């Protein structure tokens, strides 16, 4: 049997982390077993579905590199197929027209609730012999079995059973002729030959209804696996406050797709005590029986830790491709400065996100208007004039601009003045970067370049003189 899974988001908002995890699990399951992965856009909610949301879903999937073998399919383009099946069901007697008014249904609901009963359709039109006009508005309901139960073996949760008496006759076509969500899903899974449905636990109650429709159609029933929800670190339902933002927001905030994928796969799935997984390892190791039934808590600090790991473990060239987007967003012109690959090597250990890295690398490419106040107050004092002037002479004398020669110039200055490296390095750091923290001065000065370094030392010396004159 060819394994076939699907990811079927509704385009009513962004692709959030819960949806991304579901997509990842479905993708990994199919890839692990050499199957196929289908992308389906469930856009039957015409009022809430937007092209912007569709674009956000596609962007998120592409950024995460979760490729699909079929699709994207759109339910709104399959209405003729759904309605053809509904008409066949009407002819076969597995569906019927319901003419109950909204007023009758509301009164029924209120009466049931007043009696402490679960609100459900009472089957008034199920076996009715009364006639109605051809143009009289009606919905179409599925004739759900009234006896027995629906039992399915959830691949994450184990056997789940629903009594058919608890299931009312589901509306499968509205009065306006449009098919409903639960019905469209069934026909899609049937037509697309989906073998395994992996989705959120909020769909568990839909499953027995969908199974009954499939059985009424004589269609194969796929396997089902329902993943638990993601909670905030305070145990409450995930919200924007915890990190329930669109996947592309994580891109904007400077996270690598490899880090987010690694984080998402561990939100409910485990393999021993291993924390770091490449996408190849995930694909090789992923199984549904290792997915937890318990809810998972979102932890931003853990995601940042993983992101820092991948910034420093992936090939710098690969990280630089992602960094370039952030640098462009800040309007930094990198043509007159080091390659971004060098920035990744220089700043990787110091940065948890690429956004932080992009913001920190400005001084390699742009002149700064002012020195950091605290750093200048501490290190650009009159006592710093001598080491800055001395190191400038040695840096200016370098004919081959290498990291080693830069280091020797700084070290030689400290040796000649009989002071520690910090007495030279810290004023030099503030002079050439404008801030009090940076990578080692030899690699930083080398990356900034000789001419720019000498000009900035002159700027710092002028700053010291101005400051001295004001005192």
UniProtKB/Swiss-Prot annotation:
The keyword Zinc-finger does not apply. InterPro entries: aa-tRNA-synth_I_cd-bd, aa-tRNA-synth_I_codon-bd_sub2, aa-tRNA-synth_I_CS, aa_tRNA-synth_I_cd-bd_sf, Glu-tRNA-ligase_bac/mito, Glu/Gln-tRNA-synth, Glu/Gln-tRNA-synth_Ib_cat-dom, GluQ/Sye. A motif ('HIGH' region) lies at residues 9-19. ATP binds at residue 240. It comes from the Bacteria. It is an enzyme of class 6 (ligase). Its EC number is 6.1.1.17. Transmembrane segments: none annotated. Keywords: Aminoacyl-tRNA synthetase, ATP-binding, Cytoplasm, Ligase, Metal-binding, Nucleotide-binding, Protein biosynthesis, Zinc. CDD domains: GluRS_core (cd00808). Binds 1 zinc ion per subunit. GO terms for cellular component: cytosol. Its cofactor is Zn(2+). Zn(2+) binds at residues 98, 100, 125, 127. Gene3D superfamilies: 1.10.10.350, HUPs. It is found in: Cytoplasm. Signal peptide: none annotated. A motif ('KMSKS' region) lies at residues 237-241. The keyword Transmembrane helix does not apply. GO terms for biological process: glutamyl-tRNA aminoacylation. GO terms for molecular function: ATP binding; glutamate-tRNA ligase activity; tRNA binding; zinc ion binding. Its main location: cytoplasm. Monomer. Belongs to the class-I aminoacyl-tRNA synthetase family. Glutamate--tRNA ligase type 1 subfamily. Catalyzes the attachment of glutamate to tRNA(Glu) in a two-step reaction: glutamate is first activated by ATP to form Glu-AMP and then transferred to the acceptor end of tRNA(Glu). This is Glutamate--tRNA ligase. It comes from Yersinia pseudotuberculosis serotype IB (strain PB1/+). The gene is gltX.
């Amino acid at each position: 049997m060819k394994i076939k899974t699907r990811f079927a988001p509704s385009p009513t908002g962004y692709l959030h982390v819960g949806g991304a995890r579901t997509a990842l699990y479905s993708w990994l399951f199919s890839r692990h077993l050499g199957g196929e992965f289908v992308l389906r856009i469930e856009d039957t909610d015409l009022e809430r579905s937007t092209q912007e949301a569709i674009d956000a879903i596609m962007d998120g999937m592409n950024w995460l590199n979760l490729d699909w073998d079929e699709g994207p399919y759109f339910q709104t383009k399959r209405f003729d197929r759904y309605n053809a099946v509904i008409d066949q069901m009407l002819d076969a007697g597995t569906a019927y027209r319901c003419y109950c008014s909204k007023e009758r249904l509301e009164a029924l609901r209120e009466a049931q609730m007043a009696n402490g009963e679960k609100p459900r359709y009472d089957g008034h039109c199920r076996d009715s012999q009364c006639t109605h006009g051809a143009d009289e508005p009606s919905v179409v309901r599925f004739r759900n079995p009234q006896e027995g139960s629906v039992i399915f073996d959830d691949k994450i949760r184990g056997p789940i059973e629903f009594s058919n008496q608890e299931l009312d006759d589901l509306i499968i076509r509205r009065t306006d002729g449009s098919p409903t969500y639960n019905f469209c899903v069934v026909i899609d899974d049937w037509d697309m030959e989906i073998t395994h449905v992996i989705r959120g636990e909020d769909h568990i109650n839909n499953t027995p209804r969908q199974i009954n429709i499939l059985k009424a159609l004589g269609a194969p029933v796929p396997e089902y696996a329902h993943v638990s929800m993601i909670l905030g670190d305070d145990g409450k339902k995930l919200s924007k406050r915890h990190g329930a933002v669109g996947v592309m927001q994580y891109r904007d905030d400077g996270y690598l797709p490899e880090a987010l994928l690694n984080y998402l796969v561990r939100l409910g799935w485990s393999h021993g005590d291993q924390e770091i997984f490449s996408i190849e390892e995930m694909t090789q190791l992923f199984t549904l029986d290792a997915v937890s039934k318990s809810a998972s808590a979102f932890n931003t600090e853990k995601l940042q830790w993983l992101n820092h790991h991948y910034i420093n473990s992936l090939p710098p060239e690969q990280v630089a491709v992602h960094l370039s987007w952030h640098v462009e967003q800040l309007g930094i012109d990198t043509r007159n400065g080091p390659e971004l690959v060098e920035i990744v090597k220089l700043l990787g250990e110091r940065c948890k996100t690429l956004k932080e890295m992009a913001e920190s690398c400005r001084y390699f490419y742009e002149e700064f208007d002012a020195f950091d106040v605290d750093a200048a107050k501490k290190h650009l004092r009159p006592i710093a004039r001598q080491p800055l002037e001395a190191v400038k002479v040695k840096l200016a004398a370098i004919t081959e601009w290498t990291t080693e020669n830069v280091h020797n110039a700084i070290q030689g200055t400290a040796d000649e003045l009989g002071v520690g490296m910090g007495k030279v390095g810290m004023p030099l750091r503030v002079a050439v970067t404008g801030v009090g923290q940076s990578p080692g001065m030899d690699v930083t000065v080398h990356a900034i370049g000789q001419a720019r370094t000498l000009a900035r030392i002159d700027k710092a010396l002028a700053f010291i003189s101005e400051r001295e004159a004001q005192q």
